[in-house]
Amino acid sequence: NEIFENVDPALIDRIYSSKEGIDLSEFDFKDVIHPNECFVLKSDRNSVLARYNPFTHSICRVTKGRNYGIEPRNAEQSFAFEILNDPNVKLVALTGKAGTGKTLLALAAALGKLTDYKQVLLARPVVALSNKDIGFLPGDAQEKVAPYMQPLFDNLNAVSYTHLTLPTT
């Protein structure tokens, strides 16, 4: 993540107090950021997690959201959660090391959209299981893919079901 230092502390204060954000033209780095890019703004006395919103042409504060008992634990997760929960962003690609919360945050964001959509599709990339065809493994199809799908099931179990109420049809 990009860190912009020596930002005017008054601009950072304005970002904290503004719901709409601050117009991009007020920032020196306006020519080097991309739509929906997240970054840290630092001054000598304060800092803020921020994002460039291309729809409003403004720099907005990234807030620590929460869906179904799941909330970000660090700046990177806060950035991911912000973008995942923005209805104007149609596609999000998260990359990073295993175990950093990408799938869990994506699942929590998806569950937050159940009022707008009928289902959540949870998938894993298709890869050969240790270079063996699944047909040669012992057991039925569910037993064969269970170890491969377990990380997804673990993430589902991590969601607090006390917060989960599925829409009725």
Where are these regions (language model features)?
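Conserved small/polar residues in nucleotide/adenosyl-binding loops
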Residues: 162-168
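Hydrophobic anchor at the beta1->P-loop junction of P-loop NTPases
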Residues: 94
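Interdomain "pre-motor" coupling segment immediately N-terminal to P-loop NTPase/helicase cores
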Residues: 3-61
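Conserved adenine-nucleotide phosphate-binding loops and their immediately adjacent elements
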Residues: 60-69
